């Protein structure tokens, strides 16, 4: 990775080895795949989508639909006034049947389905999904090994928001953008692609109060312009950013779980960037540097606070708890809303928890769950920090503590997920009450409310 780095840091239990959900940061990778395809003559940005998917068109295509090109999809200007919400196997047909109320190229509307259409076009023309197509062209030359992507119902990759990768690989890709396609002396993707992709192609609108100033600076080919002159970014929901400052020869990678993303970008551009000098030379020794290094080395999310409770630990370990609907009481809520490990923008489904049991060791507790017919065990630290465990192909970090005599608090975070799940377990005589919520603090910025649930479990009778 041919560059100097100022700092890199993570808040424990997260660290550099875990993939992070990119959300719409994925769009910049999908656009780059289109750039390579254009370079190789596989496609032209002037091609019309009606010519690429003739068998999926409505019976009488509108004149506006006939005008949509790949260029229009890249700039979020296909003419849709609303976005389709269809991940089924027929989603391409749904997109092509959606009303095109505006002439393409004249109206901006953020449209993840439009980016998915770019992924579908690439697959139609090459037989390869985005990540496979990029493997030899981008990923291997840059040494990117962690990229994965979720699939839509027809097997097309969710190029508009389904990718994950580690922070280091996000930095490599963002650095590639900053170098306009050059890597270690070789021009992998021609410079003129980035001259189009990384500059404003269409006007965008913020809100009337100016709270989202960095979303009102214009849009390129699946990347956003920033307020700082000449800067641009790959941008994913909840604060997944790869920001490029060309005149400072600087990139900044941010992975967060917040809805206050404008505040995040404002802090970067107003509190940090003014103090960055491209030709600063060797800085004199500073005692503050050591203090900052020590502080960042100890960054950690706070674990659950409380105490041990030997009496209740022994008591509850003797029982298996079964969800109330399975006990025949359909008036009580089931556990389908409980998201162990936290929710995400594209994974809001879960299965009801049928059974659970608790056991306790010297410094950890073990929560065994039967969910959707599968048995899982989560390990939670009852001392300092978090304990790691693996379940269902994912790594989880857990922390637990007794809040009161009969109330146990647990927090479980999926390491390749966005946030975490916090659960309050209140043990009663013959049952327990489980209250669950997402750790993501919602301020309504994305119109998505983190999940909350309340359900009852009873002691399983022999």
Feature map (PLM): residue ranges:
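Short, small-residue-biased leader/transition segments that mark boundaries at the very start
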Residues: 1-6
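Structured C-terminal helix/loop/strand segments within mature extracytoplasmic catalytic/sensor domains
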Residues: 236-303
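Peripheral terminal and inter-domain segments
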Residues: 287-462
């Amino acid at each position: 990775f041919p560059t100097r780095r100022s700092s890199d840091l993570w808040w424990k239990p997260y660290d550099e080895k875990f993939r992070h959900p990119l959300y719409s940061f994925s769009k910049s990778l999908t656009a780059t795949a289109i750039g390579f395809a254009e370079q190789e003559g596989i496609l032209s940005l002037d091609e019309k989508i009606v010519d690429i998917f003739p068998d999926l068109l409505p019976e009488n295509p509108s004149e506006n639909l006939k005008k949509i090109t790949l260029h229009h999809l890249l700039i979020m200007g296909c003419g849709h006034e609303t976005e389709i919400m269809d991940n089924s196997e027929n989603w391409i047909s749904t997109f092509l049947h959606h009303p095109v109320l505006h002439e393409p190229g004249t109206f901006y509307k953020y449209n993840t389905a439009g980016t998915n259409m770019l992924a579908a076009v690439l697959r139609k023309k090459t037989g390869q999904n985005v990540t496979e197509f990029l493997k030899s062209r981008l990923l291997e030359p840059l040494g990117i090994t962690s990229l994965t992507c979720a699939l839509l119902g027809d097997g097309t990759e969710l190029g508009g928001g389904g990718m994950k990768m580690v922070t280091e690989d996000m930095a490599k890709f963002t650095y590639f953008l900053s170098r306009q396609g050059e890597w270690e002396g070789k021009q992998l993707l021609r410079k003129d692609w980035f001259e189009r992709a990384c500059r404003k192609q269409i006007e965008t609108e913020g809100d009337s109060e100016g709270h989202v100033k960095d979303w009102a600076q214009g849009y390129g080919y699946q990347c956003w312009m920033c307020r700082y002159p000449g800067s641009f970014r790959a941008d994913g929901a909840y604060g997944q950013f790869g920001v490029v400052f060309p005149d400072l020869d600087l990139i900044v990678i941010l992975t967060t779980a917040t809805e206050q993303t404008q505040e995040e970008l404002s802090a970067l551009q107003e509190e940090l960037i003014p103090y960055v000098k491209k030709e600063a030379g060797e800085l004199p020794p500073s005692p503050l540097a050591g203090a900052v290094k020590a502080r960042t080395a100890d960054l950690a999310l706070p674990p659950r606070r409380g105490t041990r409770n030997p009496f209740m630990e022994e008591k509850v370990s003797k029982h298996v708890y079964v969800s109330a609907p399975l006990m025949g009481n359909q008036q009580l809520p089931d556990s389908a809303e409980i998201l162990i490990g936290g929710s995400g923008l594209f994974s809001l489904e879960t299965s009801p928890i049928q059974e659970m049991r608790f056991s306790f060791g010297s410094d950890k507790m073990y929560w065994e769950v039967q969910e959707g017919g599968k048995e899982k065990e989560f390990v939670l630290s009852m001392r300092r920090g978090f304990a790691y465990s693996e379940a269902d192909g994912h790594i989880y970090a857990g922390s637990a503590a007794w809040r009161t005599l009969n109330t146990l608090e647990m927090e479980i975070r999926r390491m390749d997920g966005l946030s975490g799940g916090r659960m309050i377990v209140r043990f009663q005589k013959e049952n327990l009450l489980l209250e669950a919520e997402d750790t993501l603090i919602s301020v309504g910025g994305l119109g998505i409310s983190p999940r909350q649930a309340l359900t009852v479990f009873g002691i399983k009778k022999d």
